């Protein structure tokens, strides 16, 4: 019994040491770890300084105007322009824009508005990640050097049959081969399924672990694999703060 207690204490001690190591890694990978859902200027002020990459949800309104909101039927009256001003003041930082409602009718107005903002605030196109479910409408952005990504909209692999999973992989191969986007972006639970795919395609990966805080990425074996994967360019994490919406 005494030997079992000693082994238990040693294991517990090692777990504490490992957890502390992960905790102290927070902030050590600004090149890869970004802030998920920074949809208010208050959150940008509170948390933006801790991340070199922020993610913002955007809905396109009339004349290509970009409204910072997660849902198309909701508005907080927050224009995207202050975020470009923030990027102008923080050279080297990047912004990931999850565009919720890109379509045939607004794609050109969106491109013109985006390009105008980049010119006004002197922001290189490469500093923006433009993400949409409409990968087929992204070529115009891609050829003008915006970093574009297709939002992979699929259930968890664990909820799919093998045939359904293979169908998703095949569909994404067509996207990767199209040249319309530079990356595929997907929830973290798709990483192990997709990490070995499309190696003959010129395509990169982005992901989000929106239920995990930053230190959990360093703690979890899959998170460590993500950090070491050169094809995976960004991982968004949860950091709600006081002004999350």
Where are these regions (language model features)?
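Phosphate-group recognition and catalysis centered on beta-loop-alpha active-site segments
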Residues: 2-245
């Amino acid at each position: 019994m005494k030997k079992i207690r000693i082994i238990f204490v040693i294991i517990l001690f090692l777990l504490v040491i490992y957890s502390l190591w992960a905790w102290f890694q927070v902030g050590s990978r600004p090149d890869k770890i970004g802030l998920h859902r920074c949809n208010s200027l208050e959150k940008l002020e509170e948390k933006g300084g801790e991340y070199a990459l922020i993610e913002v949800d955007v809905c396109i309104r009339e004349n290509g105007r970009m409204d910072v909101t997660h849902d198309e039927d909701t508005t907080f009256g927050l224009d995207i322009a202050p975020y470009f001003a923030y990027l102008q003041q923080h050279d080297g930082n990047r912004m990931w824009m999850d565009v919720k409602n890109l379509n045939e009718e607004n794609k050109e107005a969106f491109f013109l508005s985006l390009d105008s903002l980049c010119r006004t605030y002197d922001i290189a196109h490469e500093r923006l990640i433009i993400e949409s479910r409409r990968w087929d409408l992204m070529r115009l952005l891609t050829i003008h050097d915006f970093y574009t990504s297709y939002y992979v909209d699929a259930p968890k692999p664990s909820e799919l049959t093998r045939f359904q999973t293979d169908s998703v992989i095949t569909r994404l191969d067509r996207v990767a081969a199209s040249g319309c986007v530079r990356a595929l972006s997907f929830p973290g639970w798709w990483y192990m399924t997709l990490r070995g795919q499309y190696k003959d395609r010129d395509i990169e990966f982005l992901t989000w672990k929106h239920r995990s805080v930053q230190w959990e990425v360093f703690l979890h074996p899959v998170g460590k694999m993500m950090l070491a994967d050169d094809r995976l360019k960004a991982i968004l994490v949860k950091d709600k703060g006081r002004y999350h919406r």
